[in-house]
């Protein structure tokens, strides 16, 4: 699960950087399923630059059994933006050849 934890941390950091317009949205291709990229775009439009940049603070991972036999994990954590703390969560699943992909995402 260490590989999954490293992937989750890197993916959530990249999502927050895209929302803050520090990275291009194209850098999420392959990390997230297609529909989630659109939701990150909408969060990108709502982000207020006056609040400061998002900084991922804590990430935890819980392995789960998937009914179709693929490895999966629920990921939850927190990030700060300015003086406020926010929640972030996602589900990652192992896809072909041992790669991971974010299949669900919630940004609080």
Where are the language model's segments positioned?
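Amphipathic, hydrophobic secondary-structure cores in small proteins
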Residues: 25-35, 57, 98, 107-108
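Surface-exposed, charged secondary-structure patches
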Residues: 48-85
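Core segments of small alpha/beta cavity-forming domains
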Residues: 1-50
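Extended alpha-helical regions
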Residues: 41, 73-75, 106-108
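Short beta-strand edge/turn micro-motifs at domain boundaries
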Residues: 86-108
């Amino acid at each position: 699960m260490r590989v999954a934890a490293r992937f989750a941390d890197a993916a959530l950091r990249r999502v927050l950087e895209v929302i803050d317009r520090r990275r291009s949205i194209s850098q999420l291709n392959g990390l997230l399923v297609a529909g989630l990229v659109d939701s990150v775009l909408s969060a990108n439009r709502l982000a207020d630059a006056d609040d400061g940049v998002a900084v991922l603070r804590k990430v935890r991972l819980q392995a789960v059994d998937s009914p179709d036999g693929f490895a999966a994990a629920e990921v939850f954590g927190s990030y700060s933006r300015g003086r406020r703390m926010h929640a972030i969560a996602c589900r990652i699943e192992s896809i072909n050849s041992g790669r991971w992909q974010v299949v669900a995402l919630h940004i609080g």
